[in-house]
Design a protein with these regions (language model features):
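Structured, basic alpha/beta domains of bacterial-type, RNA-associated proteins
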Residues: 2-95
Length: 95
């Protein structure tokens, strides 16, 4: 398994329950694929550096996890089609 870092931004016009269910959905994809989450940080609502899809703010989430590349591909696929996610980035963690 490889180490990865995931940062994603959830829209601010959704209910808090939707934010929580979105976070749980992505955690489930990692753990159900045999991965393990080493750090999870819901950073809260923050201002974006620039406007993305007419949004100026977003709920930031940072996740450090270990998983196989197939799990990362599935996570990326689901995030691309998720309406709640404004932007996401998955990178290999070197630490």
């Amino acid at each position: 398994m490889r180490k990865y870092e995931l940062m994603y931004i959830i829209r601010t016009d959704v209910e808090q329950e939707v934010v929580q269910s979105t976070v749980e959905k992505f955690q489930a994809i990692i753990t159900n694929g045999g991965g393990e989450i080493s750090k999870h940080d819901l950073m809260g609502k923050r201002r974006l550096a620039y406007e993305i899809n007419k949004f100026r703010d977003g709920h930031y989430v940072l996740v450090h996890f270990n998983a196989e590349p197939a799990v990362v591909a599935e996570l990326d696929r689901v995030m691309k089609i998720s309406d709640e996610v404004i932007r996401h980035l998955i990178v290999k963690d070197v630490a």
